[in-house]
Curated annotation (Swiss-Prot):
Protein name listed in UniProt: Methionine--tRNA ligase
Top-rank taxon, per record: Archaea
Subunit text: Homodimer.
Provenance organism: Methanobrevibacter smithii (strain ATCC 35061 / DSM 861 / OCM 144 / PS)
Keyword terms: Aminoacyl-tRNA synthetase, ATP-binding, Cytoplasm, Ligase, Metal-binding, Nucleotide-binding, Protein biosynthesis, RNA-binding, tRNA-binding, Zinc
Positions occupied by motif 'HIGH' region: 11-21
Gene that produces this protein: metG
Residues annotated as binding ATP: T328
Amino acid sequence: MSKIFISCALPYANGPCHLGHIRSTYLPADIYARYNRMIDNDVLLVCATDEHGTPIAVKADKENKKPIEIAKRYHDMIVRDVESMNISLDNFTRTTDDLHYEIAQNFFLELYNKGLIYKKDIQQLYCEKCNKFLPDRYVEGICPVCGSEARGDHCEKCGRALEPTELDEPKCLTCGSTPVIKDTYQYFFKLSEFEDDLKDYIDNNENLPANVRNYAKNWLKEGLNDWVLTRDMDWGIPLPLDEAKGKVLYVWVEAFLGYISSAAQWSRETGIKWEDYWNDTAIHFIGKDIIYHHSIFWPGLLKAYGCKLPDNIYAGEFLSLEGEKMSTSKNWVVWIADFVDKFDPDLLRYYLTINAPLNKDTDFSWDDFQRRNNDELADVIGNFLHRTFTFTHKFFDGEIPEYKNPSAEDNKFKEIIEKLPDTVGEYISDFEFRDGLLEIYRVAKIGNKYFNDQEPWKAVKEDMQKAANCLYLSNQLAKTLAYVLKPYIPNKADAIAKIINLTTPDEWKDAKVPLAEGHKINKAKPLFTKIEDDVINKQKEELQKNLKESEDENMSDLISIDDFDKVVIKIGQVKEAEKIEKSDKLLKLQVDIGDETRQIVAGLAKQYAPEELIDRKVAVVVNLQPAKLFGTLSEGMILATGESAALLSPDECEVGERIQ
C-alpha cells in the first residue's frame, strides 16, 4: 500500500468556481484520489482557499470592506461549489488560518537563516496620487513578451511571470494614473543557485507530463534570476523580521505552503503524520496557467528548505465556452452553483472528462453537452442498465439466473467484462482519465450489442438458458460498471449499486467478484434521462443575456472615431539607439518625428540590436503623456506587433508624415 499526498491548486478567494476550475484541477484530482482509495492506497487529498494578495485587497477597497470579509465570502462559496461537485477532499482550509501564518513565517526564517534570502535595494512603481508603492496586481499594463494586456505579476496570455516594472504602459489600478519608479528594498530568494538542481529535476523526472516539462524547459533555457519574496502592503503575512516593518510575504510564496498547512491541520485533527504521505508520493493537480510557479519556484523553495520535491505536477489545460475564451468580467462563464441548480453534477463530471484529454485545451458547448448526455449516458449506458434490470425482473423474478453451457458469444463477452477493471485502472493510474472513461463507454456499447444479438425477449420462449446467460452476464457488467464508474460519476455509481442490491462500491478488486446466482436485485429506476432541446436553449439564451448585460455595462470601454482621431501617429526615423542599464528588454531611442527629435523608451531589446534600428523608419504615437520607464523619460510610443515585437515598416513614407 502506498501513501499518496494529492493537492489541488488553491482557488483564489475573489470569486466562486466555474467550469474551468473544476475541469483543470479539482475533477482530475478527485478521480485519481477516488481510484487510489479503491485500490487500498492511503490517500491524503488537500486544498485551501488562497486569501492574501492584491486582488482581494483591491476588491475590499472598492467595497469599503476588510479583506478578510471578502475572503470569507468567497471561501464559503468555493466550499459550496467543491462539495456540490463531490470532490472528496480530506481537508479544505484557509491561508488566513493561524497555523498557516505560523508555517509560512517559519519557512521564511529557515531560508533566511540559511543565507538563501537577502535584502536588496530595487526600483519599484510608486503612485504619487495614492502615495504608496504598488505591489504587482495594483498595476496593469502591456506584457513586454507577447504584447497582451497583463497584470503586474503575470500575463494570462503567454503564462509569463512578471515584475510590475517590466510592464509597458503601466497604470495604477486604484486611480488610473501612470506611476513613477522609486527606490525601495525587498527580500529576494536565491533561486539562481538552484538552477542546476531544477534542470536535473525537470530533465530526469519521468513522471512529469510533456506540457509541464516543455514549459519548464523553455523557461530554464533563459536562465533563472533571484525571486522577490516580499511586497509593500498591509494585507498579507507579515515578515518575521523586526527590520521589515510594512513588508508581507508575496502571496505566491505562502500560497504554495497552503498545501502543507492544510495537511498539517489534518494531522492535528487526526494524529496522523502528513509527512509520511508527502515523502512517499506527492502529486500536484494545477491549471496550466500556473505551471511556471509550480515547476520552477515551488521546487526551488522546497530544495532550499531540504524537502523532497513533488513526484508529479499534473496540469490541466484551458476550457473555453462556446468557442470563446471564458471571461468572468464579461460574465461569459458558467458558474458551478448555476449548473448544479439545474443538472446532476455527475453529468458535468462525465462531460468534462470525456470531452477531451485534460492535457489539451477544449471547449464546453451546451449542444455537445446535451448530445453526450443523450447519446452516451442515456442511450448507451443508461439504456443497457435499464434493460438489464427490467428484463431480470420480468423473466427471472429479479434474481441473477443460473449461468451454464455458455456460447462462444457468451465467453467472449465475459472476457471483455473481466478485463474492464484492469484496463480502466491502468488508464487512471497513468492519468489518462478520458481514455478510461472512453473504455467504459466502449464496453457499454458492446453490452448493448450483445443484449440485442441475444434477444432475451425471444430466447425466453425458445431457449431459456440462452436468455439466462444473457441476463447473468449483463448483470455482471452492470455490477462492474458500478465500480469502474465510481471515480468518475460517484453518485450514479452508487445508484447502480443500490439497484443491484450491493453496498457502496468502494473496493476496486470487488469489481471482478461475480454476482452470485440467485442474488436478488431491486427494481429498476431510470438512471439517466435525456435533456430536452428547450432546456438547453434556455441555457444558451441565459448565457447570451448575461454577456449582453455585461457588454452594456462596459460600453464605456469603446471609443468613438472622434476619440481615435485624438491619437496622433507620425512617421519617425531612429537616429540613436542604446540599451538601458539593468534592463534586458528596453532600448532608449532618439527619434526624429519631423519637427523635433523625441526620446522614446521601447521594449525592443530582445528583438533588435541597437545598431539595427539606426535610420529605421517607425510609426510613433507622439501625443502620449510622457512617462518614466526604468528612470528614463519616454516621450512617445513605437508601434510594433505583440508577441514578435516586429516593427511596422513605413519605409516609403516621409519623416513627420501623420498616419490617418
